[in-house]
């Protein structure tokens, strides 16, 4: 599947590896050393039920992030509603996926309007990618830091070295490049929020919160996890990946600056914290770290997947204990981020009039939370499909065009792949800390082709079956018993869904 990525290298696309992020003010300590303090706890149930609501947390660190929201210095050609023109494509959402589709559709000579409440705002989160994925897109210049490989700490004694270079995206440069291509292709921008869409036979009316109505032949929802335009008709009960991260200046840290820390499952930092240790044994969290120097590092405590998600305050509390145990003293915080990523769950109604991409189209990797390789493949597929059907000699209705685009976005092989990934998520949901360690011990013992392909969504059902059998053969006897005991019901469900889902 490496060729699939390379086939679209001209697009210049990355979809963010994040769900909802929110910046919070952090209180300053009166002491010389900066430690962490937590306030009262609040329920997170409301924003897990409604992904349109951002994560809230009263738990705070003692430092104020220094970086403020930043906008690109670029002049945008704005949409003129007074002309009453019907554009070929309206893209709702100015994230990487939306801009990528806008870029390629406009390159084919079609008219595009990008609608976003903050079109110049630089994306807030730190994006990490495997270097080979960006190399396939000719986007290596958009990586501001690379590491020769990665390391996984399973416990105090066991670690895995991953011989696969990793990089951090320069999100400002990436957005600038994508915006420049959109502008040169004639994309128009409208700074507003879409609150309603009314569909007619051959066009749709997008009603914005500023009173403007944008008319378009096709509507693309690229708003992430909001689920505000794309419709679902099945109960929505995903797993949740929850993470809290900081980009910080520290006095020192113990990590090799030549390798990023992909996962650190060690729990010795909770030895004297019985309640946290018990919770971590049942639903574990790991540290993800990108060291830029001996004193500057991105640190993120992550719950891989849980249902319901681990409360943000608890994620922060575990992170505090870990950093203290590692002797990491934070001097200042450049940025902080809170992420909640819905994983798995049903696909949206297929087909439907509004086309989706990214999180709103169910494209998050259900086992890992990754979307990069998946969206790399999907953005040009969506764009090419839109160009093809809008330019068709046979006059298609709005419903017919959208149905064809959805069919290209979610062909049977992609739906089957997603079913397998959901099966993997269901197994991970049932594993405790020890089971998770055993699972990843076997996972990273696989041939690189298979764990690379699994993480980057490059394996399809025949290879995924071999992947599963290989993983089972690599696992310890204890892990095999555990997989059989906890994976039988999810396996039966997966097989049933595969049988029912036919073209």
Functional labels for PLM-detected ranges:
Residues 284, 338-357, 411-419, 428-433:
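FAD-binding beta-loop-beta segment adjacent to the flavin cofactor pocket
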Residues 104, 108, 181-332, 342-350, ...:
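Predominantly flavin-linked oxidoreductase catalytic cores and closely associated redox partners
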Residues 362-383:
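A conserved FAD-binding loop/helix module that cradles the flavin
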Residues 100-156:
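N-terminal FAD cofactor-binding segment of flavoenzymes
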Residues 65-114:
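N-terminal Rossmann-like FAD-binding beta1-loop-alpha1 element of flavoenzymes
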Residues 380-503:
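Long, low-complexity C-terminal extensions of enzymes
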Residues 1-46, 52:
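N-terminal chloroplast transit peptides
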